[in-house]
From Swiss-Prot:
Belongs to the DadA oxidoreductase family. SUPFAM superfamilies: FAD-linked reductases, C-terminal domain, FAD/NAD(P)-binding domain. The keyword Transmembrane helix does not apply. Pathway: Amino-acid degradation; D-alanine degradation; NH(3) and pyruvate from D-alanine: step 1/1. It comes from Photorhabdus laumondii subsp. laumondii (strain DSM 15139 / CIP 105565 / TT01) (Photorhabdus luminescens subsp. laumondii). This is D-amino acid dehydrogenase. One of its GO terms (biological process) is D-alanine catabolic process. It is an enzyme of class 1 (oxidoreductase). Its EC number is 1.4.99.-. The lineage of its organism: Bacteria, Pseudomonadati, Pseudomonadota, Gammaproteobacteria, Enterobacterales. GO terms for molecular function: D-amino-acid dehydrogenase activity. It catalyses: a D-alpha-amino acid + A + H2O = a 2-oxocarboxylate + AH2 + NH4(+). One of its GO terms (cellular component) is plasma membrane.
Amino acid sequence: MKILILGSGVIGVTSAWYLVQQGHEVTVIDRQGSAAEETSAANAGQISPGYATPWGAPGIPLKAIKWMFQRHAPLAIRPDGSLFQLRWMWQMLRNCDASHYAINKSRMVRLAEYSRDCIKQLRADTGIQYEGRQRGTLQLFRTNKQFDNAVNDIAVLEQEGVPYNLLTADKLATVEPALAHAAHKLTGGLQLPNDETGDCQLFTKELVKMAEAAGVTFLFNKQVKQLLVEGHRIIGVQCEDGVMTADNYVVAMGAYSTELLKGLVKIPVYPLKGYSLTMPIVDAERAPVSTALDETYKIAITRFDNRIRVGGMAEVVGFNLNLLKARHETLKMVVQDLYPGGGDITQTHFWTGLRPMTPDGTPIVGPTEYHNLYLNTGHGTLGWTMACGSSQLLADIISGKKPAIASDDLSVFRYVNGFNTKLVPFSHQLHTELRG
């Protein structure tokens, strides 16, 4: 089949890769001049299935109020009066209870664990290089309450069969030696030894080369205007320079997917703004070994070959890409507090991007009510973690194969009866009938 993918971030490019591997004729279009130039450009770099956690969690509403008065708050909300923003925040609020949190985290971990297996296989099959490390990740706790609350996440990890190590403060340096000096500031940590790290942009650009060699066509500097519809089918994509057609269409445009699909498919995907700093390593012994995640500030510090990436935070501010000095200061403060002298803080690249976030934290992967339109979006802060698994899953669905993991509760149909997180059954048999 001829398939047109809209978007060339890590989600769009991995979608292209897995689809061409199944014999499809694939074209990818993007408004940028090359792949991975927006949300995939400078994320935190962690591939962390066990830390796949929804932002909508018990206690978040109260914490959000407290964070409003903190200088280094991990979450900032700036109301703009739009119905889009208000509706999304209300939907997220409805997920901030224990039962919804457990359902959402279980879904996310399931997909993220599968995705980690997929990237391992991809690495074995292709030898792709992206400054990746397989040294695990370490969540750091600064309070006893954070340490005690880890038991809730551990229950989900055990349910999903994810290996973990709960460490007291004096044991943290056995995993991250450079943290020896900071043990007195921390109460402990949760290590996930099977997690990975790597440069998402580098991975995506390398995979573009491999996908092109396999037959995928990439068309850049191509602005998508709208989807053309006839009945329950998409008949083309209107671009600035003409119409493109295919048998099937995949929307992988991150936070911009919502506007493109307006009036066709209603998806609750909102742009959650995040920031990162990247700096050269000046003392390897003072730098992280892999990724350390500061639970208090929701900031990840990741080691690449010769660089440190510090990323995190979330702002509910719409499509705003202004770089705020205060956020730069927060990122700098955290890395200097935990890994002083590891990187050159005077030579940093400051970046911001918009993560496509759903209120329940779970991405939207799979078919729609339009027979030949598929979605791969809404991965939030976990696009890098979930990319390969989501795209392998989507390729199997489009090809009529049974996915390796349960996928019904990942599709847009979970929102059919208004916003909720209850499973709306959508069988593969019904999907086949819709495609017919």
